[in-house]
Amino acid sequence: MQRNILWISVVAAFGVFHFGECTYQDSGEDSSSMTEESRCDGPPHASRGLMNIPGWFYDGSRDQCRRYHFPDQQFDMAKNKFKTVTECRKSCRSTVPLQCFKKPPQTIRTMGLPVSTYNSTQGECVTIAVRPGQTGPNIFRREVECNETCRDPEYGKCAPLHIVDCGGSTGNHYNLDKQTCEKTTKNKCGPFATLEDCFKRCARYIQRKCNIPLLKSEYCDIVDLRYWYNSESKQCEEIMGCADDVYNFPTAKECWETCSSKEESRCLQPPDLGKLGIGRTRYYYNITSNRCLTTTHVAFWQNTEKKNNFKRRSDCENTCRPKHKDVKKL
């Protein structure tokens, strides 16, 4: 894997580093009235050095504070370079209360009272149980209050309130109920000029990422293999992407199991293995390891066209492990 990559121009590689995630991740939101707008513009601040200093930067296209490793430890208050996610949120995402990222204490449902809290990892207000009389950050008695305080401000342009009446049909918008981006209907104006802009901003709120165009984050901290579901070919394709991408899947298994089925793809069927250990060499797809492995078959006359059993390795690879044309080896 590689780190600190600009997708437009690959300029450096700094090794590998894995890090833990917050309980409630930063799912992103619009902040048009930012207190330090210039600091939040553009790419993560590029500087010289050989260090790997963890920090954060604000990604305007995703409207999200993202992890990044910088080559030096100088944090300039005027640059898109932050020591903590809280500092980034205060500077670039000030329209969303910081309480919306707090995880409140919970108790057993049978002993507590149901309240609503905003889960920024899921991008929605969920019901939890708290002790009777419990108050504090990110605890709301009603879901509508949670939506108004946290969800809608964080969704920003993806929120329903950004679709307004107008004289003609203009722009595109995010349909919260359908969880997809679409062209705005007649006499309504959407906040996005293109569907791609909408998906870039709102894809993090889509739970089933099976109809999202091929998108990649412009700036990468860690470059890794990712898996994108091609809704036309109905296959999970291997691509190069960021480890924290919100447009695709981290594993082929998750991609196949989310977007396809045993009836639709033989790649999801249990492997058709030979039982005698003799016969002609055949191939099957192991979805867990994402590999095409060998087996043997005596009953070569059987029709295996719809089974997880392939005559040639290339047939297995092309069917279950297709690579998008831009994929390069790490």
Curated annotation (Swiss-Prot):
Example GO CC term: the record gives: extracellular region
Which pairs of Cys residues are joined through disulfide bonds in the record?
40-92, 65-88, 100-150, 125-146, 158-202, 166-189, 181-198, 210-259, 220-242, 236-255, 267-320, 292-316
Q: Which domain of life is it from?
A: Eukaryota
Where in or outside the cell is it found?
A: Secreted
Q: Where is the BPTI/Kunitz inhibitor domain?
A: 40-92, 100-150, 158-202, 210-259, 267-320
Q: What is its main location?
A: secreted
Complex formation: Interacts with host coagulation factor X/F10 (inactive and activated).
- The name on file for this protein is Penthalaris
